[in-house]
Amino acid sequence: MIKLIVGLGNPGAEYAATRHNAGFWLVDQLARMGHVTLRNETRFHGYAARATLWSHEVWLLQPQTFMNRSGLATVALARFYKILPDEILVVHDELDLLPGAVKLKLGGGSGGHNGLKDIAAHLTTQQFWRLRVGIGHPRNLLPPGTAPSGQHDVANFVLKAPRREEQELIDRAIDRSLDALPDLVAGNAERAMMRLHTTG
């Protein structure tokens, strides 16, 4: 059963449309579905709201600490409400999946994602759920015949907005995720993964 859904991203209007904020996009959708407003909660270092989703109470959180300090916000809320690591779902952008792909898993490494790394360090465990929203890697998304250059490095790539066709694929992946989340929130992870990984 999931009691806390954390969307990863960077605060501020200048980052709102960037690939690194894919986690924020999904949590924004959940807030709309739950008819709640994410409010600045200084004790949790982020925007948070408690929503009733699919007949379950779930906390929604968007850390406002910048990506590399996401663990600070996640642990503050989880400890306050006595939420266990395996009751937490972290939604994040994933370079190793193409736009349109999305994967759900429990545990595993951080894959070089600094937000995940910081959350694992603060929770002192890797055993939390991750929803990996594919954004692609600059080496896979270059036009044919284009050689990678400095401007295509990963740090620059994740802080840019996706191209229109990529954004459409990411939006579709988020919609598919929302279809699978009721099962995960209710504690049926196997069915959620089957639904997510065998569609689209």
From Swiss-Prot:
<dbReference type="InterPro" id="IPR001328">
    <property type="entry name" value="Pept_tRNA_hydro"/>
</dbReference>
<comment type="function">
    <text>Catalyzes the release of premature peptidyl moieties from peptidyl-tRNA molecules trapped in stalled 50S ribosomal subunits, and thus maintains levels of free tRNAs and 50S ribosomes.</text>
</comment>
<dbReference type="GO" id="GO:0072344">
    <property type="term" value="P:rescue of stalled ribosome"/>
</dbReference>
<feature type="binding site">
    <location>
        <position position="68"/>
    </location>
    <ligand>
        <name>tRNA</name>
    </ligand>
</feature>
<feature type="site" description="Discriminates between blocked and unblocked aminoacyl-tRNA">
    <location>
        <position position="10"/>
    </location>
</feature>
<keyword id="KW-0378">Hydrolase</keyword>
<dbReference type="GO" id="GO:0006515">
    <property type="term" value="P:protein quality control for misfolded or incompletely synthesized proteins"/>
</dbReference>
<dbReference type="GO" id="GO:0000049">
    <property type="term" value="F:tRNA binding"/>
</dbReference>
<dbReference type="GO" id="GO:0004045">
    <property type="term" value="F:peptidyl-tRNA hydrolase activity"/>
</dbReference>
<dbReference type="Pfam" id="PF01195">
    <property type="entry name" value="Pept_tRNA_hydro"/>
</dbReference>
<comment type="subunit">
    <text>Monomer.</text>
</comment>
<feature type="binding site">
    <location>
        <position position="15"/>
    </location>
    <ligand>
        <name>tRNA</name>
    </ligand>
</feature>
<comment type="function">
    <text>Hydrolyzes ribosome-free peptidyl-tRNAs (with 1 or more amino acids incorporated), which drop off the ribosome during protein synthesis, or as a result of ribosome stalling.</text>
</comment>
<protein>
    <recommendedName>
        <fullName>Peptidyl-tRNA hydrolase</fullName>
        <ecNumber>3.1.1.29</ecNumber>
    </recommendedName>
</protein>
<dbReference type="GO" id="GO:0005737">
    <property type="term" value="C:cytoplasm"/>
</dbReference>
<keyword id="KW-0820">tRNA-binding</keyword>
<feature type="active site" description="Proton acceptor">
    <location>
        <position position="20"/>
    </location>
</feature>
<feature type="site" description="Stabilizes the basic form of H active site to accept a proton">
    <location>
        <position position="93"/>
    </location>
</feature>
<dbReference type="InterPro" id="IPR018171">
    <property type="entry name" value="Pept_tRNA_hydro_CS"/>
</dbReference>
<feature type="binding site">
    <location>
        <position position="66"/>
    </location>
    <ligand>
        <name>tRNA</name>
    </ligand>
</feature>
<comment type="similarity">
    <text>Belongs to the PTH family.</text>
</comment>
<keyword id="KW-0963">Cytoplasm</keyword>
<feature type="binding site">
    <location>
        <position position="114"/>
    </location>
    <ligand>
        <name>tRNA</name>
    </ligand>
</feature>
<dbReference type="InterPro" id="IPR036416">
    <property type="entry name" value="Pept_tRNA_hydro_sf"/>
</dbReference>
<keyword id="KW-0694">RNA-binding</keyword>
